[in-house]
């Protein structure tokens, strides 16, 4: 494949193990530390890259308060070997924050405003709960459904609109845990996970090497015993087929193709296209459909051209309508979330966009795919998507 000088390429991508938000392995580790460990690992793994070349550190984070406040990207940068002369910014597109960080860096590279960027995201949902400090405007209900801020109810709505049954959701949830467990046992996460010091259940220091969120014993039958979490009377969405609350971070090293070539680096992939799109906040989980269609159109591609997909599993009730309307139902087991997803691994809000992209790029490398799409829904009615081409 020939590369244009301003093509945006990925040199490397990593993530932390995923820890439970409630009394999990990272309960005594701060968000900045999780992130800084990954950034230094990128430079350890790619010693031809001088940290002084980093134009900007761009970090996704949703709840920017407490330890995640006051431009957490800069707080993180100051803990790494990136020099003080490089800049840093924190971005927030709710669930799509880390993918927006990727897009922001890519746009800068494409327009000649920098050659080397470190991007990613973090969310410590144990230390900074999802709605910490949020003050919802009551007047918003004049303009969008009052339940739009209640993500579980938006998933219930999508399931009803698309005829997704409780059994389908339970089977999809069990699939996520099964595939993530298999990926762990077979070492498929080994290249993307950076081990980080945390604590075990007894409080002793421990090197955390694997995701602690995966429940290998999960079956569709066991999930069928759970009560609805958001609509007790007639709901189908349960905690067991929803994304977990977790602590985690992810990081990527992005570069212009010409700088990568000058440094003698072999990129993993390049960005073919990017897109964001809006949808009705009451069905926020549908956002990946218009975003993906827009990104594919910009790349001159069709759904059938894509070898592998990573869809953030906010809820099974949300993922299945997206899969259905992207016409992927018949190829799920060959192409979609082959190492499990957020139902098993969790959804640390500001981290997930880079996490799913990292997992996708490793799946593409392992299985020989050329084209991949990472896409996710975003609270309040948005979607974001990236089309990747393996080099």
UniProtKB/Swiss-Prot annotation:
It is found in: Cytoplasm. SUPFAM superfamilies: Thiolase-like. It catalyses: an acyl-CoA + acetyl-CoA = a 3-oxoacyl-CoA + CoA. Its EC number is 2.3.1.16. Keywords: Acyltransferase, Cytoplasm, Fatty acid metabolism, Lipid degradation, Lipid metabolism, Transferase. The active site is at residues 95, 347, 377. Pathway: Lipid metabolism; fatty acid beta-oxidation. GO terms for molecular function: acetyl-CoA C-acyltransferase activity. Pfam families: Thiolase_C, Thiolase_N. Catalyzes the final step of fatty acid oxidation in which acetyl-CoA is released and the CoA ester of a fatty acid two carbons shorter is formed. This is 3-ketoacyl-CoA thiolase. It comes from Hahella chejuensis (strain KCTC 2396).
């Amino acid at each position: 494949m020939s590369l244009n000088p301003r093509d945006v390429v990925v040199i490397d991508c990593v993530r932390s193990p995923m820890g439970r938000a409630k009394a999990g392995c990272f309960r005594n580790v701060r968000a900045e530390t999780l992130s800084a460990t990954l950034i230094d690992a990128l430079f350890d793994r790619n010693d031809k890259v001088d940290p002084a070349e980093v134009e900007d550190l761009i970090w996704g984070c949703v709840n920017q308060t407490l330890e995640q406040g006051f431009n957490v990207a800069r707080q993180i940068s100051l803990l790494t070997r990136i020099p003080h002369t490089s800049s840093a910014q924190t971005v927030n597109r709710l669930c799509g924050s880390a993918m927006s960080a990727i897009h922001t860096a890519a746009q800068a590279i494409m327009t000649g405003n920098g050659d080397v960027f470190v991007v990613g995201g973090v969310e410590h949902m144990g230390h900074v709960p999802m709605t910490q400090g949020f003050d919802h405007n009551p007047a918003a209900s004049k303009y969008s459904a009052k339940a739009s801020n209640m993500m579980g109810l938006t998933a219930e709505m999508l399931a009803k609109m698309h005829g997704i049954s409780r059994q389908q959701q339970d089977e999809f949830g069990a699939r996520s845990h099964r595939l993530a467990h298999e990926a762990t046992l077979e070492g498929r996460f080994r290249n993307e996970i950076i081990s980080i010091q945390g604590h075990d259940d007894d409080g002793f220091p421990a090197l955390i090497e694997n995701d602690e969120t995966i429940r290998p014993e999960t079956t569709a039958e066991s999930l069928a015993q759970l009560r609805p979490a958001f609509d007790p009377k007639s709901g189908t969405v349960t905690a067991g087929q929803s994304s977990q609350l977790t602590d985690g971070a992810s990081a990527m090293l992005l570069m212009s193709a010409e700088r990568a070539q000058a440094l003698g680096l072999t990129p993993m992939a390049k960005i073919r296209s990017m897109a964001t799109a809006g949808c009705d906040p009451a069905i926020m989980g549908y956002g990946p459909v218009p975003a993906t269609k827009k990104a594919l159109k910009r790349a001159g591609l069709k759904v059938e051209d894509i070898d592998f997909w990573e869809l953030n599993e906010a809820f099974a009730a949300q993922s299945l309508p997206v899969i259905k309307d992207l016409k992927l139902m018949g190829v799920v087991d060959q192409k979609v979330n082959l190492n499990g997803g957020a139902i098993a691994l969790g959804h640390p809000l500001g981290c997930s966009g880079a996490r799913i992209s990292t997992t996708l790029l490793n799946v593409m490398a392992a299985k020989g795919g050329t084209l991949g799409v990472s896409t996710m829904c975003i609270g309040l009615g948005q979607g974001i998507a990236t089309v990747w081409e393996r080099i």
